[in-house]
Amino acid sequence: MLQQKQSLLEHKPVLSKELEKLVNHYRTLSLNGQCAQYIPALREANQTYLGLYVVHSNGIEIKSGDWQVPFTLQSISKIINFIAACLDRGITYVLDRVDVEPTGDPFNSMVRLEMRKTGKPFNPMINAGAITVASLLSGKSPTEKLESVYSLVEKMLGRRASANEAVFHSEWQTAHRNRSLAYYLKDTGYLESEVDDALHVYFTLCAIEVATKDIAKIGLILANNGYDPLSHQQIFPKEVAKLTKALMLTCGMYNASGTFAAHIGIPAKSGVSGGIMAAVPARGRSDEAMGIGIYGPAIDDFGNSVAGVALLKHLSHMWDLSIF
């Protein structure tokens, strides 16, 4: 199957047409979901959008559908937030304040957090963990903390990222559950900055605007253990990349992560804006690692893109991408 994948890459025009058919086919599944309703600015997206971008270590890029449509990272930013914090403070320091265990609960749930004796967030991929991690970034002010992340993104993408102000303000004004999480974390001693400062950083990261090409590139770097094969630079250490991919596999698709791992088997992270970032490691010398970026704003009850997950499942089976 790996040879088949390479053969497909050698016939890029044919593959592009096949992927266009797949995108158009799975686009119809968007009707089975809806755009995120609890963030007003996200309700306005066209729920029939579906875009795909695939980038390989050898430089081959394949795109299809609405791949150029901009969207905000939302929870995909938790990956970058975690990496930046590990670079700033070290893995040990970060993991002293946030765990690596799946929860099986909704991403914004407080239930298990309150039941846990220590109050330590379960993992960096849920809101409580991500808000905690945002408070760990180096710098005193939100602006200084955000610079750690913006600098990392610039190294990965080769350009300066920016946040969508309308989305940021939309989230800030409706942040009641996240505020309660942050105050609880402050009370238990895990939040290292003031509540409003941590939330400002967190919501700004969620509002960073990207397209499928951008998250595919970040996925490629993760797939190559922090190394960018296109710029030939080690962006972050292998240890950080491996830990991040483990978290993506076990916690990256909200409380559908187990099903996703069993049936698709790729380290991935989703966001309620409809984005999915996947990192496909190489499995031998003759194989090429790849990053996959998908955007489909109609999401299911778990917060994952309906059409995006179905499309990624098809690609995983067609190209034998599962790491298992």
Curated annotation (Swiss-Prot):
Keyword Hydrolase listed: yes
Organism: Halalkalibacterium halodurans (strain ATCC BAA-125 / DSM 18197 / FERM 7344 / JCM 9153 / C-125) (Bacillus halodurans)
Any single GO BP term: glutamine catabolic process
Catalytic activity as recorded in UniProt: L-glutamine + H2O = L-glutamate + NH4(+)
Residues given in the record as substrate binding sites: S75, N127, E171, N178, Y202, Y254, V272
Protein name: Glutaminase 2
MF term (GO), any: glutaminase activity
UniProt record similarity statement: Belongs to the glutaminase family.
Catalytic class of the enzyme: hydrolase
